[in-house]
Structure formats: structure tokens, C-alpha cells
Amino acid sequence: MKDVERDVIELVRAPAEDEDELIALRRGPIQWVVFNRPRARNAMTWHMYERLVEVCEEVNEDRSVRAMVLTGAGGRAFVAGTDISQFRSFSTEKDALDYEARGNHVMYTLETVRVPTIAAIAGPCTGGGAGIAASCDLRLASSSARYGFPIARTLGNCLSMQNYARLFTLLGPARARDILLTARLMDAQEMLACGLVREVVADEESLLARAQELAEELATHAPLTMWASKEAMRRIKERLLPEGADSDLILACYMSRDFKEGVEAFLAKRKPEWRGE
């Protein structure tokens, strides 16, 4: 195994206590992004979302970067959604609309970064984490990977239209509707079978080594050709979006009694009682 791979593997497995919640690690032409809240299964804070945008902007300015790899620290999760405790402060329509607008900005920035992006997924990849992975160009998984948006049984909120469109184009309407309504998580083999990931490897160490290898391969390809292909695919996806906003869907869910119940139930580790109101 190459030294650069071992270096990355050791950092991802056991980051130092004083490391930031999002680690930006440059190794040659490859920019690594490590979501670093392993005790919280790498659930995203507002700071982590902001740092992800900043790293993407830095990559856009640095022509020596040729590929990005995103993964989660600790080996237990890629990203288990947004940190739910942050939702307790939601009280107004603006809170709900701003949250989804912020999420759209993060995913758009990642989706449009000029270099190819690889999500290296081990463990749960749910909610906001599933959105991040869907915004990447390529995905690899270990055998422990699980993917989905289980909000119909956990929080009672909804996705933005942009995220619904990403899921629709990646999985097709039938499977997208299936995982959204049943709130189930796909395992690694189903992710491979439906094309969500291109490879499944045995464990986290193999996953990180393969991600580095794939990123190095992409780094040898024509940057403008890859950028044009990425942008063309994004524009095709954008044509699926209907006219008009999705604020009615967002407000109906986020301002509901059910959403407040979902947040409190999740944090209390109990089953929510849905009323449809």
C-alpha cells in the first residue's frame, strides 16, 4: 500500500481530538474531505455545511486539484444526516425555507465543483449525507454501507425539489418512490445493483484505498472534458424541475405538529406519534 493511502487511512480511522469537524486534506492532485464527528456518526452541523462550500470554492480556484474524495471519519458512518438537535430552534416559516435554501446551495456548489467528485461510503449515508453522496459524480461503498432518506418514519419533514430531482435521476421514479415512502435503507448490494454505486469493497481500508486509486485515475484525464460532461448531466437533470417553487411542500412539513414531534421523538429515542397535522 502506498504511503499516501496509509496516511489517509490512519487519519480517517482516528482523527486527532483537536481536528476540525470537517477536515480538508490535500494529497497530491487529490482533495480529501473528511466529515469528522464520528461520535455523532458524522451528522452535519451548520459549520460543516459551510466548510464544505468553502472547500469546493477553494478547489475551483486551485487548478492543481484534479479530483475530490469525500468520506466519513471513524468507519461507522459516511454522514448520518443533519444534526437533529439543530432543528429544535426552528419556529418560523423563514427557518424552514432558509434551511432548505442553504441545503440547496451546498449541494449545488458540490455538484458544480469543476473536478470529479467521489463519495466513499461506509456505514449509514442518510438524509443530508445521502444528498451529499447524490451530489457527487461517482460513489464507492464498503459492505457496511446503507443509503436512504428515512424521514417518513423519523422526522416528518421533506426534501427540496432539487434533492427529489437528484434522487429521481439517480434511481428512477419507482425506486425513488419506494425508498421515500417505505423509509427503508438500501444495503450495499442493492446500491450496486441499481447503479447508485459503481463498486462495493469488503471494508473501510479497501474503500479508502480504492477511492484514492480511482481519484488518481481521474486526475490523469482531460479536466475540461470531465467538467463539460458533469455540467451537461446537471443541465439535463435541471430540465426535470417543474416551474414554480416548492415552498408549499416545505412549509406544510416543517411547520407541522408532526415535524416538532419527529424531532423530539428522535432526540428522546422513542417512536414518534404521527397525526398528519
Residue locations for each model-derived region?
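Well-ordered beta-strand positions
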Residues: 138, 178, 182-184, 190, ...
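C-terminal long alpha-helix characteristic of the crotonase
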Residues: 38, 140-145, 197-244, 257, ...
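Short, active-site-adjacent cap segments at secondary-structure transitions
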Residues: 75-79, 125-127, 233
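Glycine- (often His-adjacent) and acidic-residue-rich active-site loop
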Residues: 12, 64, 72-108, 153-156
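CoA-thioester-processing core
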Residues: 106, 110, 120, 126-179, ...
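Conserved CoA-thioester-binding segment of acyl-CoA-metabolizing enzymes
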Residues: 1-71, 108
